[in-house]
């Protein structure tokens, strides 16, 4: 058999599809990398929508960027990508076959809502009488049995919680069915088993935050103002239970003195049997302490009790020094008792300082910096995928193959093989996608689809009709800028025929609405006043193209970085500057003309400069992908 026939034979047996289990930031990144590389991707998520833990965060370290601002474009891209099939409310039951030709056995749970009919109007949730604890807000408030996880979730389709639905449990109610204008409720929906053929599997199920309720001396669950770090993220978030206002749970008063306690659920064999460092807790505590001051009305005291500050990442030490310069107090101590403050509010903390003095100090709130543990379903997932776990129930991987599981053709990324922060998780996700793509190089493009290029409308001779979309960005912009006043001002500008203000302009529902408005209003210029074009411009341009508009008829005003952030304590100046930025963007939009991009032939040959371990690994993986590669070493 010739080598050409051998390749053909291999291609016939290799499936050009990959299953990614887990819809957090790592799973999303792996799915996008593979889908953009010519593979069909099944993105499997056990909850009703993708986003994972990152969607719950207010900000990300070390830059303190808005977490949703970074995540939302990726959510929308995942949802609209023609080579990614989202499979929500679905779990992996087993994997049979061998690398290159697996059969994944999936268990899909009922949503009780037909996603092809649901218009996400929210009437089902509004009319639903059943309230349950809201897991997305860490149990700090309530949601309905008919719900979406959060406002920017993808797919933006409601689901009915069968474990709490009155009709499913007791045979009464059906209010959601009665009021649904689209007839999307389907109580006949059943659990089903689905088999899909894939060539490789990537496991990105995320992690579980350590539950400190078993450590009674912290008072968690008994003292209202002792909260976990994830609960505190939801307190700070503009989409959280307190709408971004700094408040303690006991009486919703603004705390003036907050303590963070490090290494809860980490670095302790005796207390929790987790001897490892969770690697993210030091930095997220610093981030929370610094960001709390921005949410406070003033006079906030922040104290971080620690054993060691492990600020090991890029610019992490700078963030640590910056926090100290801003007045965050760092105490090397391990508090050993917590009791409720006067009238059950606040927390009295007893500790011994570095000089050996015993101190009792009253705080308005205590935040437990909980560590990262393996997902609760790690054992079941490992058995289904046929891989091994380590003693902490993380996926067992080699130090020299950190994304390769013990079974050939199965890869892991994110925090499933051990605690990681977001940048590390994204790097691991791309590495896992690269490895999977290398395995399936013979079948690249076999199952993927290319979008049809739609001709843009010719608006070159039409008078400008500008649409201006003003983003609140949660509280990132609206917490400082009077967005209603800016929106009203934009409507008075020459050429503007439509204005709108949205909570998150980058969310899927607003993107769909934007495309609809472009068609209905005949808009031929678009201005978005939001955050940075570096991350969001491509998203809005894709929406314009989908609506039949040339993507270069777009202008963006960065009223977050250039107004609300730099004038955080000067709302009047921030609002006036936002008006100026919008006026400038509209003036420029009036002068925009459609542009076309030339098509260039691609030379599919790679050059790697540097023959160290990184360069050699990159060259080997590129060649495994089927690309001729030159490696240069001086």
Placement of each model-derived feature along the sequence:
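Residues forming the flavin
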Residues: 1-634
């Amino acid at each position: 058999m010739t080598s050409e026939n051998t390749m053909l034979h291999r291609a016939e047996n290799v499936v050009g599809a990959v299953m990614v289990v887990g819809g957090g930031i790592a799973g999303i990144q792996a799915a996008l990398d593979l889908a953009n590389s010519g593979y069909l991707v099944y993105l499997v998520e056990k909850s009703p929508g993708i986003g994972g833990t990152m969607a719950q965060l207010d900000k990300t370290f070390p830059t303190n960027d808005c977490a949703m601002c970074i995540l939302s474009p990726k959510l929308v891209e995942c949802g609209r990508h023609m080579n990614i099939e989202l499979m929500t409310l679905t779990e992996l039951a087993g994997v049979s076959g061998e690398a290159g030709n697996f059969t994944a056995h999936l268990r899909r749970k009922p949503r009780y809502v037909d996603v092809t009919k649901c218009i996400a109007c929210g009437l089902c949730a509004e009319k639903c009488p059943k309230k349950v604890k809201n897991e997305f807000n860490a149990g700090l408030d309530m949601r309905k049995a008919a719900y979406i996880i959060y406002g920017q979730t993808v797919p933006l389709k409601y689901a009915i919680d069968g474990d709490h639905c009155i009709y499913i449990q007791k045979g009464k109610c059906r209010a959601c069915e009665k009021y649904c204008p689209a007839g999307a409720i389907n109580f006949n929906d059943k659990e089903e088993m689905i088999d899909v053929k894939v060539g490789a599997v990537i496991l990105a199920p995320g992690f579980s935050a350590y539950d400190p309720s078993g450590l009674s001396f912290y008072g968690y669950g008994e003292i209202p103002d002792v909260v976990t770090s994830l609960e505190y993220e939801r307190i700070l978030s503009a989409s959280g239970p307190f709408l971004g206002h700094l408040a303690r749970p006991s009486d919703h008063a603004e705390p003036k003195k907050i303590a963070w306690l490090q290494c809860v659920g980490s670095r302790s064999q005796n207390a929790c049997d987790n001897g490892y460092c969770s690697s993210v807790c030091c930095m997220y505590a610093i981030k929370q302490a610094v960001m709390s001051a921005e949410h406070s009305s003033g006079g906030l005291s922040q104290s971080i009790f620690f054993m060691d500050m492990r600020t090991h990442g890029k610019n992490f030490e700078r963030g640590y020094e910056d926090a100290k310069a801003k007045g965050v107090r760092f105490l090397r101590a391990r508090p050993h008792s917590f009791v409720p403050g006067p009238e059950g509010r606040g927390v009295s903390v007893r500790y011994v300082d570095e000089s050996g003095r015993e101190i009792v100090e009253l705080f308005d709130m205590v935040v437990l910096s909980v560590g990262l543990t393996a997902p609760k379903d790690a054992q079941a997932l490992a058995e289904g995928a046929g891989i091994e776990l380590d003693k902490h129930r993380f996926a067992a991987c080699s130090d020299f193959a950190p994304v390769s599981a013990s079974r050939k053709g199965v890869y892991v990324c994110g925090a499933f093989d051990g605690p990681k922060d977001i940048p590390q998780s994204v790097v691991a996700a791309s590495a896992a996608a690269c490895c999977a793509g290398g395995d399936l190089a013979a079948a690249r493009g076999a199952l993927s689809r290319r979008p049809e290029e739609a001709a843009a409308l010719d608006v070159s001779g039409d008078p400008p009709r500008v649409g201006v979309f003003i983003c609140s960005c949660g509280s990132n912009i609206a917490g400082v800028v009077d967005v209603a006043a800016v929106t009203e001002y934009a409507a008075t500008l020459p050429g503007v025929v439509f204005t709108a203000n949205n909570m998150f302009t980058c969310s899927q529902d607003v993107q769909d609405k934007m495309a609809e408005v472009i068609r209905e209003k005949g808009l031929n210029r678009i201005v978005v006043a939001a955050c940075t074009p570096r991350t969001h411009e491509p998203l809005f341009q894709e929406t314009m193209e989908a609506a039949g508009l040339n993507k270069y008829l777009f202008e963006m005003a960065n009223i977050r970085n250039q107004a609300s952030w730099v004038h955080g304590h000067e709302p009047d100046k921030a609002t006036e500057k936002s008006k100026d930025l919008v006026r400038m963007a509209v003036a420029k939009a009036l002068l925009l003309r459609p542009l076309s991009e030339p098509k260039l032939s691609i030379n599919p040959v790679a050059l790697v400069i540097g023959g160290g371990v990184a360069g050699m690994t990159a060259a080997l993986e590129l060649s495994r992908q089927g690309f001729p590669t030159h490696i240069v070493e001086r």
